Amino acid sequence: MSDPIDLTGLDYDYLRYTGVNAADQRKNHSFYLPFFRDCRRVVDLGCGDGDFVQLLVEQGVEALGVDSDPIAAEKMRARGLSIIAEDALTYLQNVEAGSLDGIFSAHLVEHLRYQAVYQLIFYANRALKSGGRIVLATPNPHALISHLDLYWLHFGHVSFYHPRLLCFFLHRVGFRSETWGENPAPPHPLLGSLYHHQAPPQANSIDPGRFERRSIDWEASPPREKLSRWRRSLRGRLARLLGLDDIVRQVNQEFAQLPADMDSLIDRVDRPFECFATAVKP
């Protein structure tokens, strides 16, 4: 009996369901075009609909997509783009050594265990010619929005990969000039939209000099003993007011520092969703 559950095209259908579209993909992927400016032949591993392949072709680059999703392959062929419907690792293992100028892969490595990622990078190094470049884009582990939202949206995600870890893998298999960074194109309004600069609460400092000085009318004053108690009480209250003034001043200073502290915190965690690692084969 055949399995009634058909998972063919599941990834493609999911991306359409969540609203991923060509316009957004082109905007996000355009950031990586300068890395391949001097390349003649570039392969996009896990190319999906082929939006980056299309961008490369428009730049005069001989671009090829590789994706195991048959529906994505059909869509690419319908657009007149070159596609090999094959697993990315299998493709790299079989392609002629030193035949590629560039390799690009966006949001593939997070679907793989680290052993497979290392294999992918190893065979990518083999496939590239001297001076060839590789770029690997993946969810940004520095971004809070990745951990709280976007990373968990896809059923196939296996692990975050810190770009420095990817750089280590790249270096270990023989790549050099490895660097990493963030792609600012994808929107990431997680904390920025929730936090607005607000002036700190204004509490008037208590200035003892503004208290009105009044003379005591001795003829109409209460008995001396009562007056003495009243004077002691007044001194105590003034002492407390003076101490409160210092507290209010300190609180105001802390409130004044709060926006800068919040900006620093937001800058550290409200990062772009996508990061990348890149390197060159010597």
Predicted regions and their residues:
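Conserved N-terminal segment of class I S-adenosyl-L-methionine
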Residues: M1-G98, G102-A106, Y118-I121, G236, ...
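Hydrophobic/aromatic residues located in beta-strands of well-ordered beta-sheets
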Residues: A63, I134-L136
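Short low-complexity, flexible loop/linker segments enriched in glycine and/or proline
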Residues: R79-S82, L100-D101, Y151-W152, G192-H196
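A short His-aromatic
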Residues: E110-L112
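A short glycine-rich, Lys/Arg-flanked "PGG" loop and its adjoining helix->strand segment in the class I
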Residues: Y118-R133
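Short, glycine-/aromatic-enriched active-site segment of Class I SAM-dependent methyltransferases
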Residues: L136-S159
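Short alpha-helix
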Residues: V158-G174
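A C-terminal cap/extension of S-adenosyl-L-methionine-dependent methyltransferases
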Residues: E178-P282
